[in-house]
């Protein structure tokens, strides 16, 4: 997919780039698959900010995506490729012979007119097909992977993401995650074949603050620009550096410090991600 750049007729246009939208074929979405989501803007039920630098952003409707792929053994046709304002991947509208319509994540290479199918048993290894991990050959790249059978895909759903099946052991399948982490996942879990499309999204330059405001991202104030009462990095005459290691406003080390709590699922992780 091509990336469009612009002549610098304003300062903000100089570095701005956007994705070419020629791959989008739909002019409107299916009304029955649209719903509203309450925008919390980073506030909790008391109205207090719990996640900074968030706002409502542009108005948008949520597209209901079929992450479970539980319409088994019925072949569907891809009727349209659509833009989804809630995610960086494109979505594909699949129409089934009984009239049912569902959105799925568009894997790279899936086009209008192609057929997709999901099954609990084995299938041909084609882009967009969904089946249980135990039926997918070792070495295959997959996306939209379940962590618990029937719960719906949770892993490798972002644009350009995929995981690879590395092996099997008892009731588990060994998966190499996009982060290079190796972990066990139950072989009864479903996954879709292929790489999530729209791979060039990572190369897009936002270019100006307004685009981030439309996405619901507010400006971030540096701690060193604050007063000492507001941040551990604050205060000092003129521009001063930090004393000691960089920390968050609440004193947690900001770089390289692991904050993940120990979980029962730690035993399913074979090796952690490799740091660059």
Curated annotation (Swiss-Prot):
UniProt key word Ribonucleoprotein: yes
Biased composition (Basic residues): 257-276
Keywords: Ribonucleoprotein, Ribosomal protein, RNA-binding, rRNA-binding
Record SMART domains: Ribosomal_L2 (SM01383), Ribosomal_L2_C (SM01382)
Biological process per Gene Ontology, one example term: cytoplasmic translation
A single Gene Ontology CC term: cytosolic large ribosomal subunit
Stored InterPro entries: NA-bd_OB-fold (IPR012340), Rib_uL2_dom2 (IPR014722), Ribosomal_uL2 (IPR002171), Ribosomal_uL2_bac/org-type (IPR005880), Ribosomal_uL2_C (IPR022669), Ribosomal_uL2_CS (IPR022671), Ribosomal_uL2_dom3 (IPR014726), Ribosomal_uL2_RNA-bd_dom (IPR022666)
GO molecular function per UniProt: RNA binding; rRNA binding; structural constituent of ribosome; transferase activity
Region annotation (Disordered) ranges: 212-276
Functional description taken from the UniProt entry: One of the primary rRNA binding proteins. Required for association of the 30S and 50S subunits to form the 70S ribosome, for tRNA binding and peptide bond formation. It has been suggested to have peptidyltransferase activity; this is somewhat controversial. Makes several contacts with the 16S rRNA in the 70S ribosome.
Family statement: Belongs to the universal ribosomal protein uL2 family.
Subunit structure: Part of the 50S ribosomal subunit. Forms a bridge to the 30S subunit in the 70S ribosome.
This protein's name: Large ribosomal subunit protein uL2
């Amino acid at each position: 997919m091509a990336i469009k750049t612009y002549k610098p007729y304003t300062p903000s246009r100089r570095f701005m780039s956007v994705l070419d939208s020629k791959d989008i074929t739909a002019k409107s979405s299916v009304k029955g698959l649209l719903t509203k989501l309450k925008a919390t803007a980073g506030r909790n039920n008391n109205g207090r900010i719990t996640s900074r630098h968030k706002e409502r952003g542009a108005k948008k409707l949520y597209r209901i995506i079929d992450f479970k792929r539980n319409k088994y053994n019925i072949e569907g046709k891809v009727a349209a490729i659509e833009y989804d304002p809630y995610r960086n991947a494109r979505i594909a509208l699949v129409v089934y012979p009984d009239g049912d319509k569902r959105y799925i994540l568009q894997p790279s290479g899936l086009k209008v007119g192609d057929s997709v199918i999901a099954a609990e048993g084995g299938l041909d290894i084609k882009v967009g097909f969904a089946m249980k991990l135990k039926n997918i050959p070792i070495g295959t790249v997959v996306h939209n992977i379940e962590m618990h059978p029937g719960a719906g895909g949770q892993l490798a759903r972002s644009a350009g993401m995929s995981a690879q099946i590395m092996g099997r052991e008892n009731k588990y399948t060994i998966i190499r995650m996009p982060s290079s982490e190796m972990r066990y996942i139950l072989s009864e879990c479903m996954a879709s074949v292929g790489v999530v499309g729209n791979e060039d999204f990572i190369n897009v330059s936002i270019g100006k603050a307004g685009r981030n405001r439309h996405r619901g991202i507010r400006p971030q104030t540096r701690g060193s620009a604050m007063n000492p009462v507001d941040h551990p990095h604050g205060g000092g005459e003129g521009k001063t550096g930090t004393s000691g290691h960089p920390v968050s406003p609440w004193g947690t080390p900001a770089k390289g410090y692991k904050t993940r709590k120990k979980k029962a699922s730690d035993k399913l992780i074979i090796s952690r991600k490799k740091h660059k």
